[in-house]
Amino acid sequence: MKLVLMGLPGAGKGTQAEQIVEKYNIPHISTGDMFRAAMKNNTELGKKAKSFMDNGDLVPDEVTNGIVRERLAEDDAKNGFLLDGFPRTVEQAAELENILSDLGTELDAVINIEVDKDVLMKRLTGRWICRTCGKTYHEIYNPPKVAGKCDLDGGELYQREDDKKETVENRLNVNMKQTKPLLDFYSEKGKLHSINGEQDINDVFVDVEKILASF
């Protein structure tokens, strides 16, 4: 079973990825893990990726695609995999098709976890952290007993810059703009399966299982 998992930040992709790889016994292949492994193993492509990252530059597609090609050719990916964080563009998606074709296979499905932007905003902007002990709270899902104070030590709760409304909204807008052409690409190929990510976590996975039952 060869899958790509998509979803905006806060959609619950990580949770579903864990359940998919456990149930179907396939490797979870994320872009970050691939880069780290290539750099740790000191491969030629790993060295190239490191030089770009050390300079604060984006790793170009030819390097990223090469690292993906090397990873998907490994033995543990022969019977299936879950790709997470790749492809990010239509160009990368087209190259993924070429890579899989060269390996004598193709994608089975692209699963997109859909969550309304307003719901994502609530999920992502609700996090507060204790300045003293670092305990994390959420305004909706795990609120403190007294607003603005830690239950454990009464420490002041603060919000990281990354969790502030303006930052989160900007991140979501950028992601939505990037993702739309990719969703259209896979929809035209008949590979796209969208799931309601606003349900309970277990119900989301039930929907995933229904899709994967046909493969």
UniProtKB/Swiss-Prot annotation:
This is Adenylate kinase. Belongs to the adenylate kinase family. Catalyzes the reversible transfer of the terminal phosphate group between ATP and AMP. Plays an important role in cellular energy homeostasis and in adenine nucleotide metabolism. Its EC number is 2.7.4.3. It comes from the Bacteria. GO terms for biological process: AMP salvage. AMP binds at residues 31, 36, 57-59, 85-88, 92, 160, 171. It comes from Listeria welshimeri serovar 6b (strain ATCC 35897 / DSM 20650 / CCUG 15529 / CIP 8149 / NCTC 11857 / SLCC 5334 / V8). It catalyses: AMP + ATP = 2 ADP. One of its GO terms (molecular function) is zinc ion binding. One of its GO terms (cellular component) is cytoplasm. Pathway: Purine metabolism; AMP biosynthesis via salvage pathway; AMP from ADP: step 1/1. Disulfide bonds: none annotated. Monomer. ATP binds at residues 10-15, 127, 136-137, 199. Keywords: ATP-binding, Cytoplasm, Kinase, Metal-binding, Nucleotide biosynthesis, Nucleotide-binding, Transferase, Zinc. Residues 30-59 are annotated as: NMP.
